[in-house]
């Protein structure tokens, strides 16, 4: 049982390091893309196509950005399952667990806000359909729609709003949550090692007391 828990803790830590690596990879490639990307309706598609075809290694950077973003979500979901199987009811585990869930939701948010950034036909109509679903949410649907679109039709303002949310708010949040997540796991590992050392010390002390009692008798 202890070996099983040890493997799960090690796997959780490895996945957490992978999550941070993917977050940094997505952030760095996103910054490189932002030098040439134009968050303007009608020109967003052309700018991305120009990056892919004219900029040296542009297609590679664009592909790495997409793959890292998708891999982040998959890795975070696997991480949640691993942490659930090896759950320890302590504050460090709870910190890692909650930050892991929030990180997964942030990754999904990053993926969702990117669907219209290329201003393709597929992305445009998919966003329109999902925007209707958001608008149907009671009480806050209209407000959310105005935040995303800028209060009007789906146009340049919408692209600019989603670009800001994607590139600044969610990206910074993802990196921060990944760091908190790893910190929680490392704290849990530290606590487990401390408990193990304490248990060994107590066992040795008891053994010494028994040996001393046997010597006296």
Predicted regions located by residue number:
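Membrane-embedded alpha-helical bundles that constitute the cytochrome b-like, heme-associated redox core
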Residues: 1-217
């Amino acid at each position: 049982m202890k070996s099983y828990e040890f493997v799960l803790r090690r796997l959780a830590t490895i996945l957490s390091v992978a999550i941070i690596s993917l977050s940094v990879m997505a952030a760095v490639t996103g910054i490189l893309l932002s030098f040439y990307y134009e968050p303007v309706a009608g020109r967003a598609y052309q700018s991305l196509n120009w990056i892919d075809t004219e900029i040296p290694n542009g297609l590679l950077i664009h592909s790495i950005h997409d793959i890292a973003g998708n891999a982040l979500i998959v890795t975070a979901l696997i991480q949640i399952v691993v942490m659930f199987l090896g759950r320890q009811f302590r504050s460090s585990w709870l910190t890692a667990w909650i930050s892991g869930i929030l990180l997964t939701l942030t990754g999904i948010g990053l993926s969702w806000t990117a669907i219209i950034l290329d201003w393709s036909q597929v992305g445009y109509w998919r966003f329109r359909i999902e925007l209707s679903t958001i608008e149907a949410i009671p009480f806050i649907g209209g407000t959310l729609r105005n935040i995303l679109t800028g209060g009007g039709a789906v146009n340049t303002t919408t692209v600019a709003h989603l670009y800001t949310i994607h590139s600044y708010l969610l990206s910074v949040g993802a990196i921060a949550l990944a760091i908190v997540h790893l910190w929680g796991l490392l704290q849990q590992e530290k606590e487990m090692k401390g408990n193990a050392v304490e248990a060994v010390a107590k066992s040795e002390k008891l053994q010494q007391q028994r040996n001393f009692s046997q010597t006296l008798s």
